[in-house]
Swiss-Prot record:
GO biological process, one term: pollen tube guidance
Tissue expression from the record: Expressed in the pistil. Detected exclusively in the synergid cells.
GO cellular component, one term: extracellular region
Main subcellular location of this protein, as a coarse class: secreted
Annotated signal sequence range: 1-19
Glycosylated residue positions: 23
Biological function: Pollen tube attractants guiding pollen tubes to the ovular micropyle.
Family affiliation: Belongs to the DEFL family.
Record's protein name: Protein LURE 1.4
Chain segments annotated as transmembrane: none
Keywords assigned: Disulfide bond, Glycoprotein, Secreted, Signal
Region of interest (PRK6 binding), ranges: 67-87
Organism: Arabidopsis thaliana (Mouse-ear cress)
């Protein structure tokens, strides 16, 4: 009788800890916003940042926007969100 109760207690403890960790990691979502009026997007300026894995997704997002002739508006790695601007590159 002792063994099943200890096992269930540990199971509840582990499941509550994992839910707390999942909630904390989702709070740390970062959205990178780019404004073409203040500084136009330059892919060479991100070369230093590409060593961080999360920026790589936004770099690909920016290249996709540039292929369409648009500026990048927002990029979020966690949500896999990539939005291009409405206005064309001049």
């Amino acid at each position: 009788m002792k063994c099943p109760s200890i096992f269930l207690t540990l199971l509840i403890f582990v499941s509550s800890c994992t839910s707390i960790l999942i909630n904390e990691s989702s709070d740390e979502q970062r959205i990178y916003s780019f404004s073409p009026t203040t500084s136009p997007f330059d892919p060479r300026s991100l070369n230093q940042e590409l060593k961080i894995g999360r920026i790589g997704y936004c770099f690909d997002c920016a290249r996709a926007c540039m292929r369409r002739g648009k500026y990048i508006r927002t990029c979020s790695f966690e949500r896999k969100l990539c939005r291009c601007s409405i206005s064309d590159i001049k």
